[in-house]
Amino acid sequence: MDLVRGLHNLAPRHRGCVATIGNYDGVHLGHQHIIAALRERASSAGVPAVVVTFEPTPREYFEGAAAPSRLTRLREKLEALESCGVDRVVVLRFDDRMRSMGATEFVDRLLVDGLAVRHVVVGHDFHFARRREGTIETLRAAGA
């Protein structure tokens, strides 16, 4: 499994994939279901299955010491994702820049320019970007 740390480390060879986005703490049964769908979609398209996750988690960023404890450390999360058959994990630093990024910029910079995603696989209650403004409908409108 490949590991890419930071948006700035995405290279042309990382373009073209099916991706999912989330914290993936614990990689529980719900996560495993999403990852299975991700792998199936990626296999059908002949591209890598990619998980995009954040370090620290958004809750840790916003809540600091009051944030709930993680179920898994980053290394354990990466091992669990690898055992689920993920081809690549992109770990994005959750900082002031990421916090303030709007949904359109997130889609454009990461999903279009950075990863050239063919499809995004997420859960039914997925939200992303500044103030959780991005939704599944945002992704659909962008063609992901």
Residue positions per predicted region:
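Nucleotidyltransferase catalytic core that binds NTPs
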Residues: 1-144
